[in-house]
């Protein structure tokens, strides 16, 4: 089966969020399972540097100007790059400039991405043509619209990684991006008078997936639907919306082979985790005390991630003898709040503003509990990494967090499926109650080890996701 993923990021070459991790791992897992899978991306500078042995597949004039389509390989996966320097060769992130302003021509930059994916489905590369075009998030949403406009030369799947980002643009651009004017309709890609690239994907895709079963249900409700809940509820009733969990790449996230750790360990030999904890306490200026549980945050510092609740609950956490480590960047108010907490509680709170992939591994290896109290979480990767490292996740029961973490209730402990802690209501009191329960388990080291081993034995591999996507593709074909 020939599958083309369409997206804007690829780990480890270019990453602004979890989307890059997904596209960096899923195609390789699909290839290992026997599918002929390739990826299409804009030729952003970091991607051009990392893709080797480039060949020119096509040269063409488009509504966005002159474009070359290049082909190369990365980590055994075939990669198409859309080389249009005037659109993609810029400093800053793929989406905004160094002053954090969205590029004014994003409508054109990502329309071109969708258009080229459709051209590949129509035979632009004479040596390879996809049977399924799998588009990811709003950046690739127009793939589904162009395919619909061209008579659906390939089946289309659209995956929602985060419904909050919708790709909204002025209606006057419809003519320039060369889609039928009839598509600008409430039964199409119109959303409150604007073009929505996200809605284009949701409306025109043959099938929509979310990155967890619970999130697929949540986005049919007003609380999580961002105005798309009506369309998504219809897709659910039609059998055209489902949830498939993301996975973990064991080549990157495996404590038994992770060279970024001070000491390697596995679920059968956990003692070396103590050395990672000691090194983390040293690195973050915490009191060296193996009896004090380290709670960690590795996240964008935003209210969506529930990190204002962590600040509210922090006094209670520290009173019980816990320590807190924070790695992340985001809202200025939250950054200042955590920095102030570190200044007020030396030896108990350590904060590093910014994101460092290597240091996130050290935190996973050294912390005891990872905090993920998100108000909503489509899938979440942090808790999956934590499970692999025996760092018990403490999560709010929403989205993918609900699908991947089993609370340490008496029933789950008895059934041998407990893997962390969860709470329902999005407030500091509920979070603090879950923290208190984690201290109860911490006071029983043998039981804590038992739950660690349960967590580390859970299978959230990309092989499982690859099989689920293959089953979906086959149903469409």
Curated annotation (Swiss-Prot):
GO BP terms, alphabetized: glycogen biosynthetic process
Residues that hold ADP-alpha-D-glucose according to the record: 15
Enzyme class label: transferase
Highest taxon listed in the record's lineage: Bacteria
Database matches in InterPro entries: Glyco_trans_1 (IPR001296), GS/SS (IPR011835), Starch_synth_cat_dom (IPR013534)
CDD domains given in the database record: GT5_Glycogen_synthase_DULL1-like (cd03791)
Keywords: Glycogen biosynthesis, Glycosyltransferase, Transferase
Any one GO molecular-function label of the UniProt entry: alpha-1,4-glucan glucosyltransferase (ADP-glucose donor) activity
Pfam families: Glyco_transf_5, Glycos_transf_1
Disulfide partners: none
Gene Ontology, cellular component aspect: cytosol
Catalytic activity: [(1->4)-alpha-D-glucosyl](n) + ADP-alpha-D-glucose = [(1->4)-alpha-D-glucosyl](n+1) + ADP + H(+)
Pathway it works in: Glycan biosynthesis; glycogen biosynthesis
EC number per UniProt: 2.4.1.21
Entry's family note: Belongs to the glycosyltransferase 1 family. Bacterial/plant glycogen synthase subfamily.
Function: Synthesizes alpha-1,4-glucan chains using ADP-glucose.
This protein's name: Glycogen synthase
Species classification: Bacteria, Pseudomonadati, Pseudomonadota, Gammaproteobacteria, Enterobacterales
């Amino acid at each position: 089966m020939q599958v083309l993923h369409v997206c804007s990021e690829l780990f480890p070459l270019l990453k602004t969020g979890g989307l890059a991790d997904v596209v960096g791992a899923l195609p390789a897992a699909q290839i290992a399972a026997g599918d002929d899978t390739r990826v299409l991306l804009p030729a952003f500078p970091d991607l051009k540097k990392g893709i080797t042995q480039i060949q020119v597949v096509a040269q063409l004039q488009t509504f966005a100007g002159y474009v070359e389509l290049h082909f190369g390989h990365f980590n055994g996966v075939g990669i198409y790059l859309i080389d249009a320097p005037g659109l993609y060769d810029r400093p800053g992130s793929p989406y905004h400039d160094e002053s954090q302003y969205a590029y004014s021509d994003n409508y054109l930059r990502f329309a071109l991405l969708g258009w080229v994916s459709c051209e590949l489905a129509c035979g632009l590369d004479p040596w390879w043509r996809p049977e399924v075009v799998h588009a990811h998030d709003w950046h690739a949403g127009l793939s589904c619209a162009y395919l619909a406009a061209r008579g659906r030369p390939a089946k289309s799947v659209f995956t929602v990684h985060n419904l909050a980002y919708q790709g909204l643009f002025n209606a006057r651009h419809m003519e320039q991006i060369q889609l039928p004017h009839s598509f600008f309709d409430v039964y199409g890609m119109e959303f409150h008078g604007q073009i929505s690239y996200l809605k284009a994907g949701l409306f025109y895709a043959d099938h929509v997936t979310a990155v967890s079963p619970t999130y697929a249900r949540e986005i049919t409700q007003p609380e999580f639907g961002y105005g798309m809940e009506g369309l998504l509820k219809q897709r659910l009733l039609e059998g055209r919306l489902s949830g498939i969990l993301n996975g973990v790449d064991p080549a990157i996230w495996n404590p038994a082979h992770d060279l970024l750790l001070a000491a390697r360990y596995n679920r059968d030999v956990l003692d070396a985790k103590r050395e990672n904890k000691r090194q983390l306490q040293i690195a973050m200026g915490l009191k060296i005390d193996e009896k004090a549980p380290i709670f960690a945050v590795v996240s964008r510092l935003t209210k969506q991630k529930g990190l204002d609740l962590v600040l509210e609950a922090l006094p209670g956490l520290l009173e019980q003898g816990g320590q807190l480590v924070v790695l992340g960047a985001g809202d200025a108010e939250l950054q200042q709040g955590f920095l102030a907490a570190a200044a007020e509680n030396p030896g108990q709170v350590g904060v590093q503003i910014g994101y460092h992939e290597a240091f996130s591994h050290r935190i996973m290896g050294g912390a005891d509990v990872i905090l993920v109290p998100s108000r909503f979480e489509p899938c979440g990767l942090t808790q999956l990494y934590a499970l692999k490292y025996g760092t018990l996740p403490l999560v709010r029961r929403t989205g993918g967090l609900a699908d991947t973490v089993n609370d340490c209730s008496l029933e789950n402990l008895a059934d041998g499926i407990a893997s962390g802690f969860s709470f329902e209501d999005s407030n500091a009191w509920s979070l603090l109650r879950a923290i208190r329960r984690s201290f109860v388990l911490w006071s029983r080291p043998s039981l804590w080890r038992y739950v660690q081993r349960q967590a580390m034995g859970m299978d959230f591999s990309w092989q499982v996701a690859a099989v689920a996507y293959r089953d979906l593709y086959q149903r469409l074909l």
